[in-house]
Amino acid sequence: MLYQLSPSDLRRFYDDGYLIIEDLFSREEVEEMAEAAERIRALGREIAAALPADEEAGERKAEHGGSQFVFGGIDRSLGSTRLLRVVWAGGCEPSFLACGRDARLTAIVGQLLGSSTAVQLLNQLHAKYPNDGLEFEPHQDSEHRRYGTPEWCDVDGRGSYVQTVVAIDDTTPENGPLIFFPGSGRQGHLDPATVRNDYRDRPGIPALLEAGSAAFFGPYVVHRSAENRGAAPRRIAINGFALPGANSRSYFGAGTGVPVELFQPS
């Protein structure tokens, strides 16, 4: 059964910039992704072993099995090159793509976008392990969608994009949760440097998702995530969807976007 958003859900999404839906997937379903995430981590370690551990090298990318492994900095818990994210994670582990195409997820995206169709741009695994040092500064996703360049057009005037996060693990205040700044997106796209400076020291609201729960957010809400200082991993499956006509940038695995019927089973 597909989740039907209420008028208050829609208002919350556009006023606060994000929406939390609890228990969208079962723990058994996300356990499959947890096992896949550990296989991906093992692959990442093999690839990282061939890379020099260089704090100043910037991002380095390697393709394997239809996925792109992105490395950068040093994993302080291992002393080796750190895996930042896996792009198009469903290439080497299909359970990630199955999650991103599941109608329980995409139907909510469709209700938020007000559209039965979209193009999928992102299918990623982000994982933080205890004391690996990985954190993300305050930012808007509109920066990464290339807002203000010919590669992006806000066709509906409300962002034209929804990003989804499915928690693979229970999120705690200690293990590096997403932190949102409600209402921060009402002004639309902001200067990235200003966002980092203005929001770096603000507390924000942590999204303490239980495994199987999901966050949905637009491209303008400011958010960040802290370092994992807990004892357990914090792994999330990310999928991003744009309205047709919004994006012209090419993404690994998706090109300019894979067409998706949002209300139909994949």
Specify the residue positions occupied by each region the protein language model found:
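A structural signal for well-ordered alpha-helical segments within the folded catalytic domains
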Residues: 103-107, 162, 210, 215
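Non-heme Fe(II)/2-oxoglutarate
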Residues: 43, 51-54, 69, 190-194, ...
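Non-heme Fe(II)-dependent double-stranded beta-helix
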Residues: 1-15, 22-149, 260-262
